Structure formats: C-alpha cells, structure tokens
C-alpha cells in the first residue's frame, strides 16, 4: 500500500515537472518578444496628446496637472494646491 502511494506521488511529480518544462518552452518565445512589444506600446502612448494629470499622477511642471492641482517638486506628483472653485 505504501509503495503504491509513493509510486503514484513520484509519477505525479514527474508529470508536473514535464508539464512545467513544456509550458516554459512554449512561453519562452513570447518572453523574448515582449520587450519589443512593450517598447512599441510606449511609443504609441508617448505620441498621443495627453489630458491633464489627475491626483497623484506623475508630472514635471504645474501645467501638467488638472485644475486645483499642483506638481509637488520633491516627488513629482500632482496634489491639491489649496485652491477652491469650479
């Protein structure tokens, strides 16, 4: 009884390792191609005209942020500038 359980666990372990290796091999080409894909997406998003940055969005100057938000100089994010209005 104990031997059959051990053999079953060993077979399941081998099958798991085999399936994992096959999956890694299958997914390997996708991982090599992904940096080029990400760079092309980055170029697309940088080329678009952007709206104002909302609360806690990254910024470099106050004009990047929406109304009533200002760019904090230390961490470069949009935060409330203390003004009220419509």
Swiss-Prot record:
Signal peptide feature range: 1-21
InterPro entries: Huwentoxin-1
Source domain of life: Eukaryota
Tagged with keyword Ligase: no
Tissue: Expressed by the venom gland.
Any one Gene Ontology molecular-function term assigned to this protein's record: ion channel inhibitor activity
Keyword list, A-Z: Amidation, Disulfide bond, Ion channel impairing toxin, Knottin, Potassium channel impairing toxin, Secreted, Signal, Toxin, Voltage-gated potassium channel impairing toxin, Voltage-gated sodium channel impairing toxin
Residue stretch(es) of the prosequence: 22-50
Keyword Signal set for record: yes
SUPFAM superfamilies for this protein: omega toxin-like
Modified residues (Phenylalanine amide): 84
Disulfide bond sites: 52-66, 59-71, 65-78
Name of one Pfam family that matches: Toxin_12
Subcellular location: Secreted
Family classification: Belongs to the neurotoxin 10 (Hwtx-1) family. 28 (Jztx-11) subfamily.
Biological role: This toxin acts as a voltage-dependent gating-modifier. It inhibits the sodium conductance (IC(50)=124 nM) and slows the fast inactivation (EC(50)=1180 nM) of Nav1.5/SCN5A. It significantly shifts the activation to more depolarized voltages and decreases the deactivation of Nav1.5 currents upon extreme depolarization, but only slightly affects voltage-dependence of steady-state inactivation. In addition, this toxin causes an approximately five-fold decrease in the rate of recovery from inactivation and an approximately 1.9-fold reduction in the closed-state inactivation rate.
Record remark: domains: The presence of a 'disulfide through disulfide knot' structurally defines this protein as a knottin.
Other information: Negative results: does not show effect on Kv1.1/KCNA1, Kv1.2/KCNA2, Kv1.3/KCNA3, Kv1.4/KCNA4, Kv3.1/KCNC1 (all expressed in oocytes), voltage-gated sodium channels (Nav1) (from DRG neurons), and in a range of voltage-gated calcium channels (expressed in rat DRG neurons). In addition, does not show significant toxic symptoms when injected into mice and into cockroaches.
Protein name: Kappa-theraphotoxin-Cg1a 6
Species this protein is from: Chilobrachys guangxiensis (Chinese earth tiger tarantula)
């Amino acid at each position: 009884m104990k031997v059959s359980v051990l053999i079953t666990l060993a077979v399941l372990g081998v099958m798991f390792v085999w399936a994992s290796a096959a999956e890694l091999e299958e997914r390997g080409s996708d991982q090599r191609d992904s940096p080029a894909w990400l760079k092309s997406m980055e170029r697309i998003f940088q080329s678009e005209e952007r709206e104002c940055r909302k609360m806690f969005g990254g910024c470099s100057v106050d004009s990047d942020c929406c109304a009533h938000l200002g760019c904090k100089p230390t961490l470069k994010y949009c935060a409330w500038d203390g003004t009220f209005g419509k």
